[in-house]
């Protein structure tokens, strides 16, 4: 496997562990991880999850790993936890509330409690359609820091301004350009396409998130050669982002078939062949193309509706 190691050592560039994340966590020294990024299995009925998973299982999973997550994280380090919703009997349960309660309550008495810095909305254009409620098109990323001080490199993640030529219309800077020449703050709403069938990053994993998400977090919240941890590695997306951004990575995946996908992707990253969609604004459709034009039967249905 070359650069990829199966057992953790702080000198490793890439550690990919096939097994329970608790075993990996036990092998990592205290106060050594700069950033934890993950998207845990969250009882939404996908093929790779236990069909008996429920909210109580989700809670216990987080309670069981929290102490070791906190232990390995550096003071001043960050945790970014990406979750969605659990739908049961048409009732939507926001899982980020559960994560917030567990993480803040369990660390409240510590010298450096976890502090929620941002509740980032990840919005995407495609997903399951619903006829009984508005179709879900967003999930959450909770960014916590261990204590008050933390890395935040805004210039590394600025995005293009919509109107870069905009000028101040009053005050002492009247007539001067009002924006930052490097771009604007990406805000806490991130419009990044999710990984569906035709996405360049698509693998056989059913709940793969795009490289652009961990890539943006890694750029903003760590420095080169920092250590990134993903306890629920899945297809290795966080590892790909870490390697591309010149950070060290350690991840665990309990299912062999997804572990093998992660290994393959990281091997491709090492030789420079991994497929990544660039973190760029979502393109507006070209209305001259057939797929973007309103089909005649749709137009007819709309007229009949009116």
Language model: regions and residue ranges:
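Short alpha-helix boundary/capping motifs
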Residues: 57, 245-246, 269-271, 277, ...
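Short, flexible loop/turn segments with low-complexity composition
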Residues: 155-158, 273-284
């Amino acid at each position: 496997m070359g650069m990829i190691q199966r057992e953790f050592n702080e000198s490793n560039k890439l550690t990919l562990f096939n097994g329970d994340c608790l075993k990996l966590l036990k092998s990592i020294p205290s106060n050594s991880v700069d950033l934890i990024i993950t998207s845990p299995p969250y009882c939404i009925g996908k093929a790779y999850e236990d069909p008996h998973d429920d909210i109580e299982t989700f809670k216990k999973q987080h309670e069981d790993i929290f102490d070791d997550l906190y232990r390995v994280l550096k003071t001043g380090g960050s945790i970014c936890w990406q979750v969605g919703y659990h739908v049961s009997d048409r009732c939507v349960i926001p899982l980020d509330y559960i994560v917030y309660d567990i993480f803040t309550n369990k660390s409240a008495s510590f010298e450096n409690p976890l502090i929620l810095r941002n509740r980032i909305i990840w919005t995407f254009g495609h997903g399951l359609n619903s006829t009984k409620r508005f179709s879900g098109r967003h999930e959450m990323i909770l960014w916590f820091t261990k204590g008050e001080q933390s890395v935040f490199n805004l210039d590394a993640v600025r995005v293009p301004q919509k109107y870069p030529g905009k000028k101040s219309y009053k005050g002492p800077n009247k007539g001067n350009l009002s924006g930052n020449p490097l771009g604007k703050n990406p805000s806490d709403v991130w419009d990044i396409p999710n990984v569906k069938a035709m996405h360049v990053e698509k693998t056989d994993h059913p709940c793969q998130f795009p490289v652009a998400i961990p890539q943006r977090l890694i750029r903003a919240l760590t420095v080169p050669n920092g250590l990134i941890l993903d306890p629920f590695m899945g297809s290795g997306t966080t590892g790909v982002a870490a390697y591309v951004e010149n950070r060290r990575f350690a991840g665990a995946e309990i299912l062999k078939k997804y572990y093998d996908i992660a290994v393959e992707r990281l091997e491709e990253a090492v030789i420079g062949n991994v497929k990544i969609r660039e973190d760029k604004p979502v393109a507006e459709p070209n209305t001259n193309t057939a797929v973007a034009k309103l089909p005649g039967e749709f137009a007819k249905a709309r007229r009949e509706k009116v």
